[in-house]
């Protein structure tokens, strides 16, 4: 959200990544409705990291399918062992078709803050307004301190 953007910029970042947030927009027509609803209903604790043992970690929605991937990794599975269940095809089965039993969906840590499916324009308008309010607040604090 706008607060996260403002905080990142204040810490010196050039920008932020908003992949999960953009999935939950009206313009994201390729994401299955089940995927979007899972994003809306998820809490911060509803994601896990898969493919860590392969040196290519990625955060996904927690499900029986993704928990199975982690168990196989813990048991020492190689890339070849996991290839069919970590492939782009497995990802597509969920994000396009809504097949949670045979696929997975990427999801960022911000997932618990997503609670609507706006248009991209609405999303940006809200973020910009939040950033502007935050900047005004900071300006007021600085102004007050310089007059002490």
Provide a role label for each language-model segment.
Residues 2-148:
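Conserved active-site-proximal phosphate/metal-binding subdomains
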């Amino acid at each position: 959200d706008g607060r996260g953007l403002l905080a990142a910029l204040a810490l010196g970042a050039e920008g932020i990544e908003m992949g999960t947030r953009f999935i939950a927009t009206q313009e994201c027509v390729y994401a299955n409705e089940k995927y979007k609803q899972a994003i809306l209903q998820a809490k911060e604790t509803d994601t896990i990291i898969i493919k860590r043992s392969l040196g290519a970690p990625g955060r996904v929605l927690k499900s029986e399918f993704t928990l199975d991937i982690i168990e196989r990794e813990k048991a020492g599975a190689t890339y070849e062992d996991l290839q069919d269940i970590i492939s782009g095809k497995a990802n597509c089965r969920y994000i396009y078709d809504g097949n949670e039993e045979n696929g997975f969906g990427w999801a960022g840590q911000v997932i618990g803050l997503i609670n609507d499916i706006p248009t991209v324009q609405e999303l940006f308008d809200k973020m910009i307004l939040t950033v502007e309010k935050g900047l005004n607040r900071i300006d007021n604090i600085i102004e007050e301190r310089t007059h002490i």
